Regions:
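Protein-protein interaction/assembly regions in multi-subunit complexes
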Residues: 1-294
Length: 294
């Protein structure tokens, strides 16, 4: 595995020398089997907004929660909610008229107070000794997710329980926005391409794939960075150029792109996915051993 690029939410890395089945298994695990925390139950005490209770609950469930799932245990239907298996949030907000608004104003931002309900209004309510033991400030990943809009007198008062789950059970538990891979492009120039043809060849590929260099006073094309190519196949529209280039892919070189929802850093997601895959392999070997003993 070679790390290519990483920032707060995205990671690009290469996996070399593996089979397509392993690469796809790894992608599917990232999408559906790395656990996260998400809103599972919503207790509606008061909701006089235009948003129906079930729609409100659905919107709350899809808000990514910044909480490390490794700190929690899975909760079954029979288990009671406690500090080990549940995170609790409260959303209580009421819209009112602004007394400072100008009489001729028509801007809701000036006329009303709390007329837009955002994810930042969700407050963590610690259960048991969570505040002391976990040393964390659990919150929504993004503060600016719009949940509902209110008018004076309307109110939302709900209590939310977040539990640990995986994307296989519900998409709200998926820790990634996208997880994909592609084979490394392989571009070979079958013969020298010079002059005006070299310039046109460069325009047939993504920026940075083909570069022009001066050799003995002539412009000559060369492959600079094949991994930047998006396989647009533009080259095949040019009859005089298409036979000068061979396009292929390296069959055991996979370029992975992972974009986190922000719940966990992308490098942590990759390491957790590897652990899940190793656990699956170990369970399979144990099953084989048990069959052989029989």
């Amino acid at each position: 595995i070679d790390m290519i690029h990483m920032d707060e939410s995205t990671l690009e890395f290469d996996m070399v020398g593996i089979d397509a089945a392993i690469a796809n298994a790894f992608r599917r695990i990232l999408l559906a089997e790395v656990p996260t925390m998400a809103v599972e139950k919503v207790f509606v005490y008061n909701n006089t907004s235009i948003v129906q209770d079930e729609i409100l609950a659905h919107r709350l469930g899809l808000i990514p929660i910044c909480a490390d799932p490794r700190l929690f245990e899975y909760k079954s239907e029979e288990d009671e909610c406690d500090e080990i298996n549940t995170l609790q949030f409260r959303l209580k907000i009421k819209c009112s008229k602004s007394l400072q608004a100008a009489r001729e104003s028509s801007d809701p931002n000036e006329l009303y107070i709390n007329h837009k309900v955002y994810s930042k209004h969700m407050e963590w309510v610690p259960l048991g000794s969570q505040a002391d033991n976990m040393n964390a400030n659990f919150r929504p990943v993004h503060d600016d997710i719009l949940i509902a809009q209110l008018r004076p007198g309307q109110e939302i008062d709900v209590l939310m329980h977040c539990v640990k789950g995986i994307g296989k059970d519900h998409a709200k538990f998926s820790p990634v926005a996208t997880a994909s891979y592609r084979l490394l492009p392989e571009i070979t120039l079958l013969q020298p391409v010079e002059g005006e043809a070299a310039e046109r060849l460069k325009k047939c590929f993504s920026s940075g794939v083909i570069e022009i260099e001066e050799i003995k006073g002539k412009k000559v094309a060369r492959v600079a960075n094949a991994r930047l190519d998006t396989f647009s196949r533009e080259i095949f529209r040019h009859d005089d150029l298409k036979n000068l280039v061979r396009l292929a892919r390296v069959r055991d070189h996979y370029i992975f792109s992972v974009e986190s929802t922000g719940i966990l850093p992308p490098d942590v997601l990759v390491s957790e996915a590897i652990k899940v895959l190793m656990g699956k392999c170990q369970r399979f070997l144990e099953e084989l051993k048990s069959i052989q003993k029989k």
